[in-house]
Amino acid sequence: MDDNKRPLYLPFAGPAILEAPLINKGSAFSEEERIFFNLEGLVPYAIETIEEQASRAYDQFRSFNNDLDKHIYLRNIQDTNETLFYRLVQNNISEMMPIIYTPTVGLACERFSKNYRRNRGLFISYPNKDRIDDILNNSTRQKVKIIVVTDGERILGLGDQGIGGMGIPIGKLSLYTSCGGISPAYTLPITLDVGTDNPQLLEDPMYMGWRHPRIGGEEYAEFIEAFMQAVHVRWPDTLIQFEDFAQKNAMPILERYKDRYCCFNDDIQGTAAVAVGCLLAACKAAGTELNQQRIAFLGAGSAGCGIAEAIVAQMVSEGISDEQARTQVCMVDRWGLLLDNMPNLLPFQQKLAQKCANIQNWNNFSDNISLLDVVNNAKPTVLIGVSGVPGLFTEEIIRAMHSHCARPIIFPMSNPTSRVEATPKDILHWTSGQALVATGSPFEPVVVDGETYEIAQCNNSFIFPGIGLGVLASGARHVSDAMLMASSRALAECSPLAIDGTGPLLPKLEDIHAVSKHIAFAVGKVAVEQGLTLPMSDEILQQSIEGNFWKPEYRRYKRTSF
């Protein structure tokens, strides 16, 4: 029987019900419920449906003049009535996703302490490091199955936001529910408050976090270890998603824990998975294979290198050697093209640095080999931007790329919109509409020579909700590389571009539920094949996916004694 058809038995009544966001129905409580739960007179007389409530809420949403106010309004609904919040978002997903997540969430993080209204999630501060178990036990969520955790050091492209980074876990988990059908009762946002190196926050009298420079080294590592162990004891089967950790910590944390616990890093692995899915769809539209592409990256941090490694793995799966695949990938950062003779490269960068011997025949390049030098010599067919610096994909670079590639694949993926390497409008005009474009933030359709081009948002929300649903439905103990690769292929299979040559690389957000279920099945199937969960048939896996897919509908309540 569908959970939404079963009555929910509650041992309390009166105002306490109206103060519980997971339970509150507001004006939708039936006459019987109002009597049994002592709610008569506490809500207006009229009994409304959830759609009537959502219609009123949407009118109120539209009355706000700026996106931050809209964000705050939606968060207030979420903190009052989560079922209504998710029905409202589900009904208006394309309009509201940029409000509850990127790009608006960046401003919400910057103003988190100033706009703080009500608690949500857990703040685990370093001075309380010996009481992490107690803090986890304080959570109002008892059956946590997915945690999104950040330390606030690298929030989007905005840098260190301290505890203001909590906006990211809250936003991500909102997408797990609205896109992936994960019950909000199973989600928990957590911020690890290890101080901040942002002087504006340290000097801000309203800042609500621990006023102390960030800890590092052994202190930081021991704190993370204590947190991971405590979570595993409290909720041994939960999926932990790492979010917006600084480059120096993100990869080491992932490497340390990915084989010990069920966890993944969305900035590294989720971004990589959605980028590869986009690339596979673009290659199919261009009539070629990924292993035939030459790829240039602008940005060689953990996210960029994570994408590059995922691309290499996919190329290898298509039949070329690992060594050959790496010669086809050029990583450019602020110091130019990464070369194997460069000092101070991070371990994950060293594996992607080009051998100096590979560029001996290049012409007219500077001491620090620029992106334009790479475009003119390596002649890439794919250009991916994860630099966080706006405007670096110049007209000269894009036109140079188009001169040797009829249908260049160009992904300016930096967030938020203000930090994008080039706008889709410019890219499509510079390439006469021939570029295959996907971006990290939402953009309006572009018209070139009378043709309208929909712009795909290469957003992790197309991937991580499906991964989470697949892990929950299958009971996977770990998130393997093969599961992530399966998610990319499943996403590519959903691309509308195969049907419409001017369509977007990725599906519409209105189709996100079907996409997430498709990805969840692919992820869960690989988990079963790899022995990361109990054996189950495809039919049972599909049933589990449907059974775990929560819908924003009110349940009937019955009263029970304590």
UniProtKB/Swiss-Prot annotation:
Entry note: cofactor: Divalent metal cations. Prefers magnesium or manganese.
EC number: 1.1.1.38
Keywords for this protein: Metal-binding, NAD, Oxidoreductase
Enzyme class: oxidoreductase
Subunit structure: Homotetramer.
Xref: Pfam families: malic, Malic_M
Similarity annotation: Belongs to the malic enzymes family.
Active site: Y101, K172
Residues involved in a divalent metal cation binding: E243, D244, D267
Identification of the protein by name: NAD-dependent malic enzyme
Cofactor field: Mg(2+); Mn(2+)
Residues noted as binding NAD(+) in the record, renumbered to the chain: R154, D267, N415
